[in-house]
């Protein structure tokens, strides 16, 4: 195990140029060569991941992370564009033979979560987020995504002259969403030309989760849900806590709204036809225990898998919230922002890519995965070019599936052995796509 002090030293000691893997310029890199290269780079991937995990950064604040990425890519001979989409990095590797352009994407941002993993390289970082000082943790595995894509960069750089086409590596900030009032994520990366300089023909992404280690799963067409940020504001009348009848009881308003949201999601729409979720996770009101405040702000999220269901739920939520406010003599409004569309896996690419994934993890590929109510702004890339988004299982040995910490948990961790599988999956998807007729 690498301790807290030795992690950076290990990265520095291993940060060397990638060796050439194939001296025959006319031949595509073989499966054995890719496997050997992925195995060789595994210690570096682990070191990168531990370093990034120990130094997490929130969305649009990934300055240290992006500097590390740019440094490593430049050392490998990539053409590097920095400050794309604020703190994003794009690395371009032009192969020795002409061909198409394929992109691979990793997200870089962490979450305002207090880490409880007990790892030697656990985060102790605090940062400012929306006016508050918060703990910061890589609780969704983005540290592993960056490390694996750097490993992929190392493997690809070692076979550059045998690559038929160009590989674009997109290291994206703010996938979890920017702070209120900011822009960020895939939207800004696309606006800054991440898919256009050069013009990308297809894009692939990998995301770790608590499934069986080394399992690669995905499904054609809709895979991850669409996502909308929900903000509910209520304006009432302040009163003393001892005289609630003289004002608007905001606690009762909040309780009724929460109950109504649960009713809408579970009782007013056909849950069998298309899954949907409406969740309230934030309630802000009041400063003293004996004063009923004038204002209430609630925050949540909505997840759907079809445009029709999304539009229907938005209308229902807005109508219901306004009606509850009227009932209490308050003005209540529901606003939906930061929409992410459904993450759509191109059917043709989904069928084709299974063979590439089988080479990365033989016998552990599921191309009929269940729908995921999580959301991803990778979906914005998939709106622009054909795409496939794949999940990589990373549950540690001995951890029961039923109790494995999920993404966004303060206990979330990943079996480091799966990084090698992730690197192979990314390399095979990229190379096989470029060799595809």
Language-model-detected regions and their locations in the chain:
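Acidic/His- and Gly-rich active-site-bordering loop/insert found
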Residues: 28-138, 147-168
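Histidine/acidic-residue-rich, glycine-tolerant segments that coordinate divalent metal ions
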Residues: 126-137, 143-144, 155-156, 161-279, ...
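Metal-dependent amide/peptide-bond hydrolase catalytic core
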Residues: 28, 75, 255-437
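Sec/Tat signal peptide C-region and signal peptidase I cleavage site
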Residues: 19-26
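Soluble non-cytosolic domains of exported or imported proteins
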Residues: 39-46, 56-67, 139, 143, ...
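Hydrophobic beta-strand positions in extracellular immunoglobulin-like domains
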Residues: 93, 234-236, 302
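Divalent metal-coordination and catalytic microenvironments
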Residues: 52, 91, 104, 142, ...
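Bacterial N-terminal signal peptides
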Residues: 6-19
């Amino acid at each position: 195990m690498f301790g807290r002090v030795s992690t950076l030293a290990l990265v520095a000691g291993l940060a060397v140029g990638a060796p050439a893997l194939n001296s025959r310029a006319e031949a595509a890199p073989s499966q054995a060569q890719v496997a050997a290269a992925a195995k060789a780079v595994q210690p570096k991937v682990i070191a990168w991941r531990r370093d990034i995990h120990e130094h997490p950064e929130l969305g649009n604040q990934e300055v240290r992370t992006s500097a590390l990425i740019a440094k490593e890519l430049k050392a490998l001979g990539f053409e590097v564009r920095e400050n794309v989409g604020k703190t994003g990095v794009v690395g371009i590797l032009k192969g020795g033979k002409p061909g198409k352009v394929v992109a691979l994407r990793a997200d870089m941002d962490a979450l305002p979560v207090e880490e409880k993993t007990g790892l030697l390289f656990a985060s102790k970082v605090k940062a400012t987020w929306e006016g508050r000082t918060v703990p910061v943790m890589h609780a969704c595995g983005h540290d592993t995504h960056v490390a694996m894509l750097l490993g992929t960069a190392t493997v690809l750089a070692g076979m550059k002259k045998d690559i038929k086409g160009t590989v674009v590596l997109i290291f994206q900030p703010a996938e979890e969403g920017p702070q209120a009032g900011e822009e960020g994520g895939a939207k800004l990366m696309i606006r800054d030309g991440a898919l256009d300089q050069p013009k990308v023909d297809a894009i692939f992404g990998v995301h770790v989760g608590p499934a069986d280690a080394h399992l690669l799963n995905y499904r054609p067409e809709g895979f991850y849900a669409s996502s909308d940020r929900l903000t509910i504001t209520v304006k009432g009348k302040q009163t003393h806590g001892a005289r609630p009848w003289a004002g608007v009881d905001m606690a009762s308003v909040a309780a009724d709204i929460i109950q109504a949201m649960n009713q809408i999601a579970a009782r007013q729409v056909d849950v069998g036809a298309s899954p949907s979720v409406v969740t309230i996770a934030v309630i802000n009101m009041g400063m003293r225990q004996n004063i009923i405040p004038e204002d209430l702000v609630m925050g949540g999220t909505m997840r759907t898998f079809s445009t029709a269901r999304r539009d229907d739920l938005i209308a229902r939520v807005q109508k219901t919230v306004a009606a509850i406010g009227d009932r209490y003599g308050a003005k209540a409004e529901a606003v939906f922002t930061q929409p992410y569309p459904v993450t759509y896996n191109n059917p043709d690419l989904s069928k084709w890519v299974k063979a590439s994934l089988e080479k990365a993890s033989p016998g552990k590929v599921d191309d009929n995965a269940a729908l995921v109510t999580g959301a991803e702004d990778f979906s914005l890339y998939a709106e622009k070019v054909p795409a496939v988004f794949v999940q990589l299982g990373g549950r540690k040995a001995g951890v029961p599936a039923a109790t494995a910490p999920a993404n966004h948990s303060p206990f979330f961790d990943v079996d480091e052995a799966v990084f090698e599988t992730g690197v192979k999956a990314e390399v095979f998807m990229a190379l096989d796509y470029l060799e595809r007729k």
